[in-house]
Amino acid sequence: MGIIKFLKNVGKEMKKVTWPKGKELTRYTITVITTVIFFAIFFALIDSGITQLIRLIVE
C-alpha cells in the first residue's frame, strides 16, 4: 500500500468522523484542562511529600 493510497484512505475516514460542536467542544476542553491541573497539583504534592520523607530518612 503506497503512501498516496494511505492518505486517500485517511481522507475518507476523516469525512466519517463526527466532530463536536462549539458548546460540546468547550465543555470537553474545560474538563481536560481542569483534570490536567488537578493531577499536576496532586503529583506535585505527592512529590514534595516524598522528597521531605526522604530528607528525614537521610538526615
From Swiss-Prot:
Predominant place of localization: membrane
Membrane topology of this protein: Single-pass membrane protein
Alphabetized UniProt keyword annotations: Cell membrane, Membrane, Protein transport, Translocation, Transmembrane, Transmembrane helix, Transport
Annotated PROSITE patterns: SECE_SEC61G
Keyword Membrane applies: yes
Disulfide bonds: none
The organism's place on the tree of life at top rank: Bacteria
Transmembrane domains' residue ranges: 30-50
Stored InterPro entries: SecE_bac, SecE_sf, Translocase_SecE/Sec61-g
Similarity comment: Belongs to the SecE/SEC61-gamma family.
Subunit architecture: Component of the Sec protein translocase complex. Heterotrimer consisting of SecY, SecE and SecG subunits. The heterotrimers can form oligomers, although 1 heterotrimer is thought to be able to translocate proteins. Interacts with the ribosome. Interacts with SecDF, and other proteins may be involved. Interacts with SecA.
Descriptive protein name: Protein translocase subunit SecE
Organism for this UniProt entry: Bacillus licheniformis
